[in-house]
From Swiss-Prot:
GO cellular component: cytosolic large ribosomal subunit
GO terms classed as biological process: translation
Record-given protein name: Large ribosomal subunit protein uL15
Compositional bias (Gly residues): 21-37
Lineage of producing organism: Bacteria, Pseudomonadati, Pseudomonadota, Alphaproteobacteria, Hyphomicrobiales
PROSITE patterns xrefs: RIBOSOMAL_L15
Pfam family, one: Ribosomal_L27A
Record InterPro entries: Ribosomal_uL15 (IPR030878), Ribosomal_uL15/eL18 (IPR021131), Ribosomal_uL15/eL18_sf (IPR036227), Ribosomal_uL15_bac-type (IPR005749), Ribosomal_uL15_CS (IPR001196)
Gene Ontology MF term list: rRNA binding; structural constituent of ribosome
Biological function: Binds to the 23S rRNA.
Family of the protein in this entry: Belongs to the universal ribosomal protein uL15 family.
Amino acid sequence: MKLSDIADNAGSRKKRMRVGRGIGSGKGKTAGRGGKGQTARSGVRIKGFEGGQMPLHRRLPKRGFNNIFRLDFAEINLDRLQEAVDAKTIDGSGVINAETLVASGVLRRAKDGVRLLGRGELKAKLTIEVHGATKTAIEAVEKAGGTVKILAPAKKDEGEAA
């Protein structure tokens, strides 16, 4: 057997059909595109159109809404705070708030405030001022000898709401 003897199995490769080449070819005139009109033209597809069948986006019910007054808090866990204190990124003796967390690079931005979450363990005695905290986070900070002060969240202006 030689390399030149190798061939595909019969019928495994189908010849490409050249369309629109006369009625005798069997694929002339409309070239398999149905009738005339928008769908017979090149590059045109009607988004979401399912051939007259009720499209999926209209079969499903409308649901929910976007609350323009929703506040988006930056979240920080206790283990991340402890890492920052251990690495001396933040000073544990002072008050830790949104400004100090952003200035030290622990958070990228404070968004509408900071929310303290309870993942991990906290050993350092910290004074924390945040806009929200979970029960477990508050308990863990107080167990370590620190305090948590919950600030009132900054209200969004009506013009600022997006």
